[in-house]
């Protein structure tokens, strides 16, 4: 194979190296006229044509080989064109008539690693081929990488709660419905007597505490500034104060209503009436203070920014006065504890 290649004559360039570098017309003699005039006759030489150079030992990818082949041919064409005169155009025509076979082997591209340009920008490309065009289209969806950590908001995340329904549920838990077993009020089992027993102090404290616990998250929501939602919150607080007043004071005792005593026992120790009354006052006062703090939260979140006299200001003032009246009666022991 090496002997065959060496026996093949080497084709030289049509212009000498000096004329090619200067991009001037060459007489194509040995030496050329230009080199003789410049006193460079000994330096005048013709290099081998690049079109017949040695091929690469290893075959590169189809894209590199095709681009390098075309680049070489266009370079040689430019070098040769710089030395052509008007009478030499026939040689260019004969060279241009030659067919250049470029073989593109797509199998060689399998070893090329795919670099996703969208990945570097923080996007995830969808490599699923399109059914209509057969092209790969990038899907401009934000990735979960450290470059872009912003996630698309879920449509149900903004309105995943219903403050009005929750407020109605809390208000309904304070309702005195004698037809249900879970009511705060208990009716007498004797129908003809038609008497209703007032809920005990422990029942009132338990129900009111659960209602206030469920009300606090609703007060901190932005929906609490809506007037109709704020009125529901005000109704819940008014109902809580109402049950405190009914359970603590004795002025709401009427015909057909009876009080139920509550027995307090600390382990094996039985407390007398005075100890039970003292313990009840302490627990009730503590729960009333908690209700007062919830009322302050309602006043701060439901208030408007205009600084005017809103309806909730009057409602909060009335509820505070009523709550303070219950607290003062407990402290003075004027109310009748159950």
Swiss-Prot record:
GO terms for cellular component: nucleus. Residues 16-44 bind DNA. GO terms for molecular function: DNA binding; DNA-binding transcription factor activity, RNA polymerase II-specific; zinc ion binding. Disruption phenotype: Impairs the red pigmentation due to the production of fusarubin. Results in complete down-regulation of the other five FSR genes. Its main location: nucleus. Keywords: DNA-binding, Metal-binding, Nucleus, Transcription, Transcription regulation, Zinc. It is found in: Nucleus. Gene3D superfamilies: Zn(2)-C6 fungal-type DNA-binding domain. The keyword Transmembrane helix does not apply. Induction: Expression is induced in presence of sodium nitrate, and repressed by glutamine. Pfam families: AflR, Zn_clus. Signal peptide: none annotated. The keyword Nucleus applies. Transcription factor that regulates the expression of the gene cluster that mediates the biosynthesis of fusarubins, highly pigmented naphthoquinones responsible for the coloration of the fruiting bodies. PANTHER family: MONODICTYPHENONE CLUSTER TRANSCRIPTION FACTOR-RELATED, OLEATE-ACTIVATED TRANSCRIPTION FACTOR 1-RELATED. This is Fusarubin cluster-specific transcription factor fsr6. It comes from Gibberella fujikuroi (strain CBS 195.34 / IMI 58289 / NRRL A-6831) (Bakanae and foot rot disease fungus).
């Amino acid at each position: 194979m090496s002997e065959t290649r060496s026996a093949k004559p080497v084709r030289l360039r049509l212009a000498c190296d000096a004329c090619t570098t200067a991009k001037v017309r060459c007489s194509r003699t040995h030496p050329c006229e230009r080199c003789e005039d410049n006193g460079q006759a000994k330096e005048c030489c013709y290099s081998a044509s690049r079109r017949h150079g040695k091929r690469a030992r290893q075959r590169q990818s189809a894209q590199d080989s095709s681009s390098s082949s075309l680049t070489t041919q266009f370079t040689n064409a430019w070098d040769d064109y710089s030395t052509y005169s008007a009478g030499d155009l026939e040689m260019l025509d004969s060279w241009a008539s030659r067919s250049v076979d470029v073989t593109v082997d797509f199998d060689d591209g399998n070893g090329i690693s795919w670099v996703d340009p969208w990945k570097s920008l923080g996007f995830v490309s969808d490599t699923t081929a399109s059914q209509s065009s057969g092209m790969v289209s990038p899907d401009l969806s934000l990735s979960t990488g450290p470059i872009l950590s912003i996630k698309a908001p879920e449509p149900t995340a903004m309105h995943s709660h219903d403050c009005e329904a929750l407020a109605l549920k809390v208000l309904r838990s304070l309702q005195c419905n004698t037809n249900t077993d879970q009511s705060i009020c208990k009716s007498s089992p004797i129908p003809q007597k038609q008497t209703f027993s007032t809920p005990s102090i422990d029942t009132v404290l338990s129900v009111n505490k659960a209602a206030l616990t469920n009300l606090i998250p609703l007060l901190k929501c932005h929906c609490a500034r809506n007037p109709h939602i704020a009125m529901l919150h005000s109704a819940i607080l008014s109902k809580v104060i109402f049950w405190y007043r009914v359970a603590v004071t004795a002025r709401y005792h009427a015909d057909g209503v009876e009080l139920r005593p509550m027995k307090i026992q600390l382990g094996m120790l039985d407390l007398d009436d005075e100890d039970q009354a003292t313990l009840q006052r302490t627990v009730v006062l503590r729960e009333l203070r908690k209700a007062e703090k919830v009322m302050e939260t309602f006043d701060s979140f439901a208030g408007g920014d205009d600084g005017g006299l809103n309806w909730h200001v009057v409602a909060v003032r009335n509820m505070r006065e009523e709550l303070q009246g219950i607290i003062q009666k407990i402290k003075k022991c004027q109310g009748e504890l159950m």
